[in-house]
């Protein structure tokens, strides 16, 4: 059994659907202290490393711990979690009709520390303004990197994908299973 050090319901569902036994411990972290001027793969790796360090200071040495974090990058702009609907709209407008990448960093602390950064790139059609408005009103974007839900709102607009869907949802399951 592993311990998912994350409050993400999407990551928990990914593990459950993959048949991986786990327990979940909430792990809150303020990403704003990590510089977004870094390349996205470095940024997300720094976030997950810092999250791991803070968790271990607060909870002591546990084993079989899984830490993960994701960010969305559109062009040279890193998109974290939107603070409000206006910021979510700005992030989604960057994605509409464009190519964006989701970077997910994972650290698994078992017998050894294993680190992985994965990337999935999507090309999206233009988003419908009415559907975008409904999505924003639903609040489903809250707590999601780039306000993106690849399994719901963004899904119907995908015109191409390079990489694993699970990476875009917060865990690269193919790599994680190899870790285990």
Predicted regions and their residues:
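Cofactor-binding loop segments of dinucleotide-utilizing enzymes, especially the Rossmann-like FAD-
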Residues: 7, 27, 111
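A short beta-strand-loop structural module common to alpha/beta enzyme folds
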Residues: 22-33
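Surface-exposed, flexible loop/turn segments at secondary-structure boundaries
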Residues: 10, 30-32, 114
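Anionic-ligand binding patches
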Residues: 2, 38-180
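N-terminal beta1-alpha1 ligand-phosphate binding loop
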Residues: 1-20
């Amino acid at each position: 059994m592993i311990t998912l050090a994350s409050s993400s319901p999407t990551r928990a569902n990914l593990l459950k659907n993959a048949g991986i036994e786990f327990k979940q411990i909430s792990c809150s972290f303020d990403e704003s202290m990590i510089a977004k001027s870094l390349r996205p793969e470095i940024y997300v790796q720094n976030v997950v490393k810092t999250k791991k360090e803070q968790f271990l200071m607060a909870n002591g040495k546990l084993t079989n711990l899984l830490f993960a974090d994701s960010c969305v990058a559109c062009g040279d702009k890193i998109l974290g979690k939107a603070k409000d609907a206006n910021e979510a709209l700005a992030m989604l407008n960057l994605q509409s009709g464009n190519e964006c990448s989701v970077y997910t960093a994972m650290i698994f602390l078992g017998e050894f520390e294993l680190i992985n950064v994965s990337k999935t790139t999507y090309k999206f059609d233009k988003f419908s303004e009415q559907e975008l408005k409904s999505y924003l009103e639903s609040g489903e974007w809250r707590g999601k990197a780039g306000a993106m839900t690849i399994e719901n709102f963004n899904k119907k607009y995908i015109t191409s994908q390079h990489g694993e869907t699970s990476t875009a949802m917060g865990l690269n399951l193919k790599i994680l299973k190899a870790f285990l």
